Regions:
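Surface-exposed, charge/polar-rich loops and edge strands
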Residues: 1-326
Length: 326
């Protein structure tokens, strides 16, 4: 398949720049895969689609304020990972001239480049004292949000159930849920730390030539058993799908617990094995996430749904509306 097969026209004004006033004040498109019927509902009506034997699976990763600025404000440093508390893998902008031995000052911390991982800007940096994300860091809002992060984003660009530090981006399907709704749903958690690769476009013309970014995940034995035993598994977000499909045993069909890194790339005609329903936001044209949801339904049905979403002026992307695929 071609990357261009997943393109659609999206007016800029439909890209949500801010969250709704309250969590859950969103529209919800409901897609029935068996009939092709598309409904236009409100997220507040989600309870109508919850079944007694469901298990709703959420990603409990927590977004870390991982974006820093040098004291001279000439460089932006995005923490991608940590080899130790003081040795970070970073994306530095501009970073092409940042060679081994160069130093960066962030507050009272001094970082020294100890390795060049990628000429464009990925560096290993060793700090004398690590900068503090909570007091010095900024949230790395997605590039399609055309404003700087604000204090309110620390609450709204975070799920209410986030607990495992390590994500650069939020698992945005979960942003619609408040504590009251969570308490009413039979649920459990997996962890996938969403990385900066989630924003990178597909550069290859053919899907099979695209190399997926790697992300760290964890699935406990207890949760794996609950999912195997569930009558219907509802994944809240594409990140949950990536964890579960990465952990399916090819022979038994059951889930293997554990932790590791996944580079799974899901696109048609891949058949999902561990998920029965999916709640997700609306995704970018030609993105790997649009390809994933197309594998779960079909490319034709998904593009039809997106065309209706544009015509009906749904709000798109991280702070936007959602879609329930049954």
């Amino acid at each position: 398949m071609q990357t261009d097969d997943f393109d659609f026209k999206l007016p800029d004004e439909l890209i949500a720049q801010r969250p709704p006033e309250r969590r859950g004040d969103s529209r919800m498109m409901v897609i029935h895969r068996d009939t092709g019927v598309i409904e236009h509902r409100q997220f507040s009506e989600l309870h109508e689609y919850v079944e007694a034997d469901d298990l709703w699976v959420f990603n409990d990763t927590r977004v870390e304020p991982a974006r820093f600025f040098s004291n001279d404000e000439r460089m932006e440093i995005l923490k991608l990972d940590a080899a130790s508390p003081t040795v970070w893998k970073c994306l530095v902008k501009p970073g092409k001239r940042l060679k081994v031995g160069r130093t960066i000052e962030i507050g009272k911390s001094t970082g020294t480049v100890i390795d060049v991982l990628e000429p464009g800007g990925e560096r290993m940096i060793e700090f004398d004292v690590a900068p503090d994300p909570e007091s010095q860091g900024h949230l790395a809002l997605p590039p399609y949000i055309s404003r700087e992060d604000e204090e309110s984003d620390r609450d709204r660009y975070q799920t209410v159930y986030a607990r495992e530090n390590g994500a650069i981006a939020a698992p945005t399907a979960g942003l619609h849920f408040d504590d009251e709704l969570m308490a009413s749903l039979p649920h459990d958690f997996v962890t996938l730390h969403v990385g900066v690769g989630t924003f990178r476009p597909v550069s290859a013309d053919k899907l099979e030539e695209h190399h997926m970014h790697s992300e760290r995940y964890e699935l406990s034995a207890e949760t794996a058993q609950k999912i195997d035993d569930a009558k219907r598994v509802v994944a809240v977000g594409t990140t949950v799908v990536r964890v579960l499909e990465s952990c399916v045993d090819s022979e038994s069909g059951s889930l293997k617990s554990g932790k590791g890194e996944t580079e799974i790339f899901i696109y048609p005609p891949y058949q999902l094995k561990a998920v029965d329903a999916l709640l997700t936001n609306f995704h970018l044209p030609k993105s790997t996430l649009l390809m994933l949801v197309s594998a779960f339904s079909s490319r034709e049905l998904m593009l039809k749904a997106y065309e209706q979403a544009v015509d009906s002026r749904y709000r798109f992307f991280s702070y936007g509306d959602c879609m329930l695929i049954l």
